[in-house]
Amino acid sequence: PFEIVVSRNNLVIDLGTLTDEYEKEISIHTTATSKDGEKTILAGKEVTIVDTVKLDGLTKGTKYQLKGWQMLKEENAELLIDGKRVENDYTFVADDEEMKVEISYTFNASALGGKNLVTFEELYDLSNPDEPVKVAEHKDIEDDGQTVLITERIIKIHTTATDKDGNKELEAGKDVTIID
C-alpha cells in the first residue's frame, strides 16, 4: 500500500490508502464430446455428452457449483426433451486454483439427427449457500469446442425378391406370388 497526498493552497485532501490488490477473474475453457472423445454422436434413445471443463482462478477451499445445459445451435434455444431442459450440475470444493471437472448429460436424442448441440456453463460460489454468487460463465453458441453434432441413424436394408421356388424370373399371370 502507498499513500497519495493531494494539496492546493495549503488544503490537503486525504484520499485514504490505496492498494493494488485485484479480484481474480475465473476463466472457463470447455470441450464437449461423446464418451469416446468424438465430436459426433449417433442419434439414439440414450446418448451421453461429456463436458470437460477447465477452471482457472479458483479460490482454494471454496465450495463451487458448476451448472450446465444443452442448447440447439441453429435455433439458439435450450434443448428440451419431454418439456424438460437437458441439464446437470456438479458441486465441489476447490483443491487448487486450477481444476478440471467433467459433467455428463445423458438423454434421448432419437429425434435430433442432424442437430448441433452446444453446452453452456455457469459457475457459482457457494460460500453462502443461501445466496449463491455467479462468478463465471461460458455461453458461446458459436464455440466449436462446446459443440457436438448428433448424426442421423441410417439403416440400410438389402432385399432379394423371388418366386416361391427361389427363381428371379417370373411368368406374368393372374396368381403370381413374390417372396421378399
Walk through the language-model features, giving the residues of each.
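Solvent-exposed loop/turn and edge beta-strand elements of beta-rich ligand-binding domains
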Residues: P1-D180
